[in-house]
Amino acid sequence: MTAMVSSYSRSDIERVVRAVLEKQIGSPKAAVPASAENPLVVNISARHVHLTEEHVEILFGKGAKLEPMKWLYQDGYYAAKQTVMIVGPRKRMLPEVRVLGPCRPSQVELAFTDSISLGIDAPVRVSGDHHDTPGCVLVGPEGVVELKSGVIRAMRHVHMGPSDLARYDVKSGDRMHLRIVSEGCTTTLEDVVVRGDPKVKLEVHLDTDEGNAINLSAATSVELIKPHACACEAH
């Protein structure tokens, strides 16, 4: 996963953007104050695989364990040293796809372009929802695993702890908007599903297609917005 990168700190960028906006349109109403305890982080989640302990041993040998290579933003989660090859219909392949740990039910998360490359019609799903999803073949150095289901395009989502849920006045399963300001690509992404958990830090996950489309690496501002139903819907 790759985060927004800048030679300036997030607070510096937000301060400059607010100053410009205040001159042009008056003081904007931010979704969360800049001094919020838990800052908003937006990361790109590249294609990856989750594996059960059983599948780790099949693919990498008896007694094999996932070995952390790089720790991720969420505490306790990591990109492992191990990679696998994904094989789709008609023998289309994606080599060296990173495994993420720790172990959990086996699942493959792809971007839309990845699924096209593999020839797999992967539905957009919340992670863990494998109902009526396609499968694939995973190839490791010591063995092969055929997944009957579990290949998805991960729905863009935001991880929130209890204080974040309270601050944004949302609950797990709600959907939010993410506004990204970047030169030539300023965009608002809808349907960012909220995933609440007591142990997580505030973080939005987008896939590589979404991150590239909004030019996330050059973004100067990101903001989570709670959508409000049109007043006409109440009648």
Regions found by a protein language model. Name each.
Residues 1-38:
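Protein-protein interaction and targeting regions used for scaffolding, dimerization, and localization
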Residues 6-9, 35-38, 67, 104, ...:
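Serine/threonine-rich low-complexity intrinsically disordered regions
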Residues 29-33, 137-142, 187, 230:
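Short amphipathic alpha-helical segments, especially helix-boundary/capping motifs
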Residues 41-43, 48-89, 95-141, 146-179, ...:
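Short beta-strand-centered segments at strand-helix junctions
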Residues 95, 184-192, 229-235:
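Short, Lys/Arg- and Gly-enriched loop/turn segments at beta-strand edges
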Residues 224-226:
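Conserved active-site motif detector
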